[in-house]
């Protein structure tokens, strides 16, 4: 009788360990698959950028993200859904960013403004005065209709302050 209890207990422990290991192994495979999926970094909802400009920006954003470890995103919009551009940029960043660290650069065509949203550790690097400097550098190209150039200049300025 004691032998049967021992075998039963041994079987339960083995099944429990097998289940734990299988679950942990399956989780690892899922995480590995997610790592290979590139994250979108340019959201051109206002259709301001050409495919070539989007490709160039994505390359710059990917390199900047690797350097900083931040989520760095670009958004263009022509409708902020009744929100201020800062609220819109903040909500967008919070919804899209994988972690809280990073920057979203926004061109808002509805209000004809540019905006920067920061999150996490990026907020320590990009103070209010630095954001103003970055925005000031972005106004010249955007006033000439050079949207990609505006975003590229702002991104380079972000990296200066990193």
List the predicted regions and their residue ranges.
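A structural boundary signal for the start of the first folded domain, especially the loop/turn
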Residues: 2-162
């Amino acid at each position: 009788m004691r032998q049967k209890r021992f075998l039963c207990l041994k079987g339960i422990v083995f099944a429990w360990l097998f289940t734990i290991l299988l679950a942990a192994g399956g989780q690892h495979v899922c995480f590995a698959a997610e790592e290979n999926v590139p994250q979108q970094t340019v959201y051109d909802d206002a259709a301001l950028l050409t495919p070539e400009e989007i490709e160039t920006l994505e390359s710059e954003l990917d390199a900047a993200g690797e350097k900083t470890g931040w989520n760095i995103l670009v958004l263009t919009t022509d409708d902020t859904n009744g929100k201020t551009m800062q609220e819109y940029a903040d909500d967008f960043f919070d919804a899209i960013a994988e972690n809280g660290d990073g920057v979203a650069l926004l061109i808002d065509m509805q209000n004809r403004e540019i905006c920067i949203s920061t999150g996490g550790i990026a907020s320590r690097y990009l103070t209010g005065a630095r954001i103003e400097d970055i925005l000031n550098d972005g106004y010249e190209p955007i006033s000439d209709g050079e949207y990609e150039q505006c975003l590229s200049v702002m991104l380079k300025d972000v990296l200066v302050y990193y």
